[in-house]
Amino acid sequence: MSTAETLYNDFRLENFFVGDFVSDGIIVKPNGKLIRRFKVEGQSNFKKGTLTLNERFTYDDGEVDKRVWQILCLPDGSYEGYTTDLVGPPPRNHPTENLFSWSYRLKLPVKNIPVTLRFTDMMHFHNNAISNVLSL
């Protein structure tokens, strides 16, 4: 079995996110229309069942944003995520092969007005890289 096959058959976020990471992604409307492109540069740390992701987003229009996720690694193999601008219940899901997705709501400033947005975040893991698709 190849390394990639082993990774996908026993995929764990805490084994993938080790140290520094980079990801490219897009934000799309529910109809698939592209809204923005972004790049995420981050650092990860795993301690006592919690994966911490420190993320720095750079958008194609030059805007920069930061977010820290605390992701609990639960005994049933699922993950539950927390961040400061989360609204409502935390996202929770299991990874499947090389895909991890979850839905959540964040309160974010849009033209300096706080707005609650619903996201579906799909992370595709391939060749030691990540592609993100965020759908509003």
Language-model features: locations:
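Amphipathic, well-ordered alpha-helical segments in soluble domains
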Residues: 17-20, 98, 126
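Glycine-rich, aromatic-bearing surface loops/beta-hairpins
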Residues: 118-136
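Solvent-exposed, flexible loop/coil residues
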Residues: 15-17, 31, 121
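Central antiparallel beta-sheet cores of small beta-barrel/beta-sandwich binding domains
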Residues: 24-112, 116-118
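N-terminal helix-cap/turn-to-beta initiation motif at the start of protein domains
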Residues: 4-20, 46
